[in-house]
Amino acid sequence: MEESLSQRKRCGDQVLDHTLHTLNMLYKENHIRPSRVSRIAINPLWNIVIGSQNECGISDNVSKNPALYTNHNHPEVMRLQGMVGKPLFDIAEQGISSGNLQDRSLAIAAMSALSQQFLGCSSVRKRGYQAQCWMAADTIVQQYPMISRLITHDDVVALVGYDSLARNLRGHCHKLHVVDQNPSETFRTVLLDRTVTYGPLDIILHTTDEMPDILGSADVVLIPASSLVDDSFRTLVNYVHHARLVGLYGMCGALIPDEFLLQGVDFITSFRIDNPSRFIESMQHDPDMANVVRMTQRHFLVMRPDADRGVAR
């Protein structure tokens, strides 16, 4: 008998360890020799790992160490430089078990680099999942594939983190709740004419104290992939009780989806780095790598086979 939504297990437990194991199996099955780290880029907002065959991986940087950007003799700079030349799998394995947020972020970036050749839509489909890919200039972007395929006007949606997704979701669901660690006034605009009104409209802002209740009662929950870096992913998934769908979004989500979809995530929306030369050039000259990735690399939406079942087209 098919399991009901309430019976579907959403645990998020050791998902990175299982993903690394699956990556190892894919490399062995396809007789591919894994690369070593050829370059690391550190930015206050992101970390990048480049492999020796120009594989590119990116992850959110949630650690704070201003000295890295001004003192090339800083012990941490020297320590991180020591990772260059090591196997990507070693950086990933050591980092995901580390309590050091910088190492954990670099581990996810290394896993992202290792994942790239298995993120193509044809490769994902061969492994039994639905996949859709597009570029920023494609018409499909205007149709918001995630929204049109998965979210209905009757859904109560909870978004963790105030992201551009909030703008796209406005008007496409019954209610949109956004939970962010920053105070709600960070995102508010006061509009003054003959009256006083406040924006954004149609978005209900919440503090993190309200997280369990908001995520526990929503129909669709969207979790940032940056939660993999600070190790809050499992906690967020465990807050979900009622949701029909749980989605993962963001740059850190550029990982093979297999284990996430087995552990209770229903869909992932992220990016595949299929123009490495543009990516490598930009990482040195453009601090807004999120926009670079959004505009120059391939977007993807990966889903469980029945994730969009029952959604009106």
Question: Predicted regions span which residues?
Answer:
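Conserved acidic residues
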Residues: D155, H174, D219, D266
